[in-house]
Amino acid sequence: GYYPFVFEDPHSYYEKVSRVIDKTVFEDIATYYNLKTPNLQYFKRLLTYLASIPPGDLNFHNLAKSLGVDHKTVEHYVSILASVGLVREMRPYEGGGPGLRKPSKILLNNTNLIHTLQQYLGHQPSKGMERELFFVQSLQNAGIEIFYSKQADYRTRKVIFEIGGKNKTRE
């Protein structure tokens, strides 16, 4: 597991991860960013939403509309979630030209968060979602700068990566 308490009691692991999420949102974010309790629910809803969609399918305008806030607020809240380590913000590879200038790709910070939030939703995470997040998490944790790309799923400054699955081809 991503968190050290996985060895303490594997049966209560996801419950403990859920408590980490709640503590981070309702105590750490509330205190550090001086946010009121009603606003904190948006953070939990954002995380749950991110766990339910394929990586890269986040549309700030649509999400803002469904939450009843403006898109700048959603963008700000996502940046807060990134600063506290609950999500990862991916930037486009600028070498691809103007066609890549779209909002950041937002991923949960690690696969344990996906499993915990999916369990909360009563779902199983998709293998593709897990595979992509594990890849990104591994490279970023190793200090490698990685971007999302129009050519393939991801790239570094020199190498292009397509995260395969059973329906992927070599083209």
Per-region residue spans from a language model:
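Interdomain hinge/linker elements that couple catalytic modules in large macromolecular machines
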Residues: G1-H115
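A cross-kingdom feature that marks ATP-driven nucleic-acid transaction machinery
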Residues: S79, G85-E171
